[in-house]
Regions:
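Conserved N-terminal beta1-alpha1 strand-loop-helix module at the mouth
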Residues: 1-156
Length: 156
């Protein structure tokens, strides 16, 4: 995994075309589309991407989904980065990489400042990006922050 110190701005939970074009005006780098049926931001129907801003990377968010469904959904929606929030194994991530997708694996950080360094290291060769998020009872982002100092010793 290459370490990139550049800031990337991603807005996630995009569902309707009007909202997508409004966010595009903010000059974001990435837009996220949630394909997890339990999420309130679930995108059940694929968008028509003919008017989509193609200079923005499209991220598909999945949780413990079958690889074939991830592939088909991603291809249908022109997804470039697959973001995984479940218990997907490194081998699962590697298969998606070999299929030509960039892979982002999400890891939960708990309030006790414990960083899952051993677990993260298992994914270094099969993921292009990591997303560190505050632990919640469910999957996905909560909007709550954690103590970023917990990441200071990690050199991935």
């Amino acid at each position: 995994m290459a370490f990139n110190k550049n800031l990337v701005i991603k807005v996630c939970g995009m569902r309707d075309e009007e909202n997508i074009h409004a966010v595009e005006q903010l000059d974001v780098d990435w837009m996220g589309f949630v394909f997890y049926p339990e999420s309130p931001r679930y995108m059940a129907q694929p968008l028509g991407f003919k008017n989509f801003p193609f200079d923005v990377k499209r991220v598909g968010v999945f949780v413990n989904e079958q690889k074939d469904i991830v592939r088909k959904t991603s291809l249908k929606n022109l997804i470039q980065v697959i973001q995984l929030h479940g218990s997907e194994l490194p081998s699962y991530c590697r298969v998606l990489q070999l299929d030509g997708f960039e892979v982002m694996k999400a890891f939960s950080i708990d309030s006790e400042r414990r960083f899952p360094v051993k677990k993260v290291r298992l994914y270094e060769k099969c993921c292009d990006y990591f997303l560190f998020d505050t632990r919640t009872s469910g999957y996905g982002g909560s909007g709550r922050k954690f103590d970023w100092d917990v990441l200071s010793d990690y050199r991935g």
